[in-house]
Design a protein with these regions (language model features):
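Active-site beta-alpha connecting loops in nucleotide-dependent enzymes
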Residues: 45-48, 332, 357-388
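Active-site regions of enzymes building and remodeling cell-envelope glycoconjugates
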Residues: 76-85, 148-151, 254-257
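Phosphate-binding loop of NTP-binding sites
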Residues: 10, 90-238, 242-255, 285, ...
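N-terminal leader/targeting and accessory segments in enzymes
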Residues: 1-93, 97, 241, 268-273, ...
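Short gly/ser/thr-rich secondary-structure transition/capping motifs
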Residues: 18-27, 89-92, 155-158, 177-183, ...
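Conserved phosphate/oxyanion-binding catalytic-loop motifs
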Residues: 351
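Acidic, Mg2+-coordinating active-site environments of NTP-dependent enzymes
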Residues: 9-10, 71-77, 194-348, 371-372
Length: 388
């Protein structure tokens, strides 16, 4: 793909290219991975500035440089520098254009807790209902049974759009992906055609990065204000404090809103009764009552399952088979996962809970299933949000 193709419609960028129109073979923001024909995005971060590595990138064969307005031009006259106001956002948009194709139905899930489980449950429901489905998040990229390990909740733009393109090429039509506050704040999801956006909940996390709770919420809200397509649907937890704010934001854009939870108008949780193998649910949806057995323990898993249900309905699934499919859900690895029993028969669970709210939630979830003492073992990484 020529630079002029990649920058199509951006006259300012083409002007800065000064007649140079190299063949672009890839994109990267890591100067060490530059190859012949790559665009090097000189991004600034909390600890380093990519503009320091422009010369290194050119030595390795960079065909063009994407950088912030005001960045000095490189000494190599044949390597154009494209200055933009927001290099991170533009980098993601270029990655989307370079890789080209995406599955038709992409649901992005944000919130402090529940993103992974909701994404995997959504993928499972779509698959049960006969759709070629995949997911992207903390557990890596999953598509048609294959798994590609990952370490970030939201991958960098190149890995993300490459993954979406590969999913499209193998026939995946439905993708559920996690949208972290870091990923949203750093514009990693820009260029993704999000058709359904879901919000699970919000509690203290990542304040070492965002600086305040308001900024943390604002990063999450970008999914609804900036990224959800104009004819998309917002799936919102009606039981959280942020519901009214997000609903008003979405309605102002003319978006469809679908709510779930005890206070919801669309998928209303009437009752959730725990038993030895899961939870008995009574739901009101589409003017009908549904009684099903969810094979998952914990009220938080109930909410994650309802979020997934709302997502698949918002993406076009018929409500009756979608609700019945909840009875076939399987637990997610590392999320309230039963890994064994002690010598005296006490069950041992592993859970990803790492925030104060998540720890409290998971302990409350096991209480109905435990007559005696609950032992909780947890750790805390250093150098992060000490208030947790």
């Amino acid at each position: 793909m020529r630079l002029s193709e990649l920058m199509a419609g951006d006259q300012a960028a083409l002007k800065h290219a000064q007649g140079q129109d190299p063949d672009i073979t890839g994109l990267t923001a890591d100067s060490r991975t530059v190859k012949d024909g790559y665009i090097f995005a000189a991004l600034s971060g909390a600890k380093d500035d990519g503009s320091k590595y422009i010369a290194d990138a050119i030595k390795l064969g960079a065909a063009a440089i994407l950088a912030k307005d005001g960045t000095p031009r490189p000494s190599a006259p044949t390597v154009p520098l494209i200055p933009v106001e927001n290099p991170r956002k533009r980098y993601a948009q270029l990655a989307a254009r370079f890789y080209g194709q995406q599955p038709a139905n992409i649901a992005a899930i944000t919130g402090t807790n529940g993103k992974t489980s909701t994404a995997i449950f959504t993928e499972q429901l779509w698959t049960i209902m006969g759709n070629m489905s995949g997911s992207i998040g903390t557990l890596g990229i999953r598509a048609a049974g294959a798994k590609i390990p990952g370490s970030l909740t939201t991958p960098d733009p190149v890995a993300l759009h490459q993954g979406l393109n590969e999913m499209y090429e193998i026939g995946v039509t439905h993708v559920a992906m996690e949208a972290s506050s870091h990923g949203l704040d750093q514009y990693r999801l820009d260029g993704v055609k999000v058709t359904v956006a879901a919000f699970t909940n919000l509690s203290r996390d990542h304040l070492d990065y965002h600086g305040s709770f308001d900024k943390y919420f604002a990063a999450k809200a970008r999914l609804f204000s900036d990224l959800l397509v104009a004819d998309g649907t917002a799936v919102l937890n009606a039981d959280v404090e942020q519901f009214a704010t997000l609903k008003a934001m979405c309605e102002k854009r003319g978006l469809t809103v679908m709510s779930y939870g005890e206070n919801a108008d669309d998928i209303k949780l009437v009752s959730a009764i725990p038993d030895s193998t899961g939870t008995k649910l009574t739901l009101l949806a589409n003017k009908g009552e549904y009684k099903i057995h969810l094979p998952l323990m914990g009220s938080f898993q109930v909410m994650n399952a309802l979020a997934a249900l709302a997502i698949v309905i918002a993406s076009g699934a018929d409500i009756d088979p979608a609700v019945l499919a909840l009875e076939k859900l399987e637990g997610v690895r590392g999320r309230m996962e039963l890994v064994g029993k002690t010598s005296f028969g006490a069950p041992v669970f592993v859970d990803y809970a790492h925030t104060p709210d998540a720890l409290e939630t998971v302990i409350k979830a096991v209480r109905p299933h435990c007559k005696g003492r609950i032992v909780c073992v947890f750790g805390a990484g250093g150098d992060r949000d000490t208030g947790k």
